[in-house]
Amino acid sequence: MRKWLGLLLFPLVAQAAGEGSWQASSIGVTLSNRGVAMSSRPLAPSEPVSGQMSLVVWNYSLIGPTPGGLQVRLCSQSRCTEIDGESGTTQAFNGVPAIEPLRFIWEVPGGGRLIPALKVQSNSVIVNYR
């Protein structure tokens, strides 16, 4: 019984210790040309938070094929990290204020038209902080 009570109270203890998480998502972008970087809308907490980011979970969804050479970065106001794949985790933002918004930056190197265009259906992050 004590074990279950402890498990039930853990989220409250974590909250009291200043730990938490926020989630945000947005619709994606359409990238029609190589050599041009496009940014998602800022993904930010819906309520004020305090603390420093720890583990960040990302996810994005494409409509259609992934262009060869696609580069995707996840950026705060103070730093960026390259991400690989449509979902994953990173600790690259450890120490960044949890209130800072994040953005996905999309780019396919080269020049000329991108056929078919890169269509990002959605972007999302879950930011854990303490």
Regions found by a protein language model. Give the residues of each.
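Short, intrinsically disordered low-complexity segments
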Residues: 1-2, 72
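Disulfide-rich extracellular domains of secreted proteins
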Residues: 16-130
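Sec-dependent N-terminal signal peptides
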Residues: 3-13
